[in-house]
Design a protein with these regions (language model features):
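C-terminal helical cap and adjacent loop that interface with cofactors, partners, or active-site loops
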Residues: 81-152
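Active-site-lining helix/loop region of Rossmann-like oxidoreductase modules
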Residues: 1-80, 84-88, 107, 114
């Protein structure tokens, strides 16, 4: 944290994927990182330690992408040790006409992550040989039957 140097967060790629899917042309992209803290001591069983009040508990990474079309995409990812009042949350806001906000409190994060990986398998099997970037894969499909039924 003290060095101020960070590798791109996974939101860096998300902005590129969103631009690709929306037909936008990125002209600049920057990332800002901010430490997260908590007002009281936090006991982390995962880290096997207590994080003192005011010490960093994680980081917020904000990625801003400007496009040739004049549309700005800003994404934020927060990874931190949770306090007792914290929970997973997904918030999406679209500013324009009309403005739209979507808020999902306590999504089934583990299940969604696993389902996303499994549902991606048919697209990976059908993809061209060699290295391709994931923005070239089709949108993910929800599999409700046998995976072989999706391999047409």
């Amino acid at each position: 944290m003290e060095s101020g140097e960070y590798v791109p967060s996974y939101m860096w790629n998300q902005n590129g994927w969103l631009c690709e899917r929306l037909g936008l042309t990125p002209v600049s992209q920057v990332q800002q990182c901010f430490p997260t803290t908590h007002s009281t001591d936090l006991v982390s069983s995962t880290l096997g330690m207590t994080i003192r009040a005011g010490d960093p508990t994680g980081m917020s990474a904000v990625v801003t992408t400007e496009t040739k079309e004049g549309i700005t995409i800003e994404t934020e990812c927060i990874g931190k040790v949770y306090g007792p009042e914290d929970f997973d949350r997904n918030d999406w806001s679209f500013y324009g006409e009309p403005e739209v906000s979507i808020h999902v409190d306590r999504p089934a994060t583990v299940e969604l992550t696993c389902a996303n990986l499994i549902n991606r398998i048919p697209a990976l099997i059908r993809s061209e040989p060699g290295y391709i970037t994931t923005d070239k894969l089709p949108n993910n499909r929800y599999i409700v039957g046998k995976i072989t039924d999706y391999l047409d």
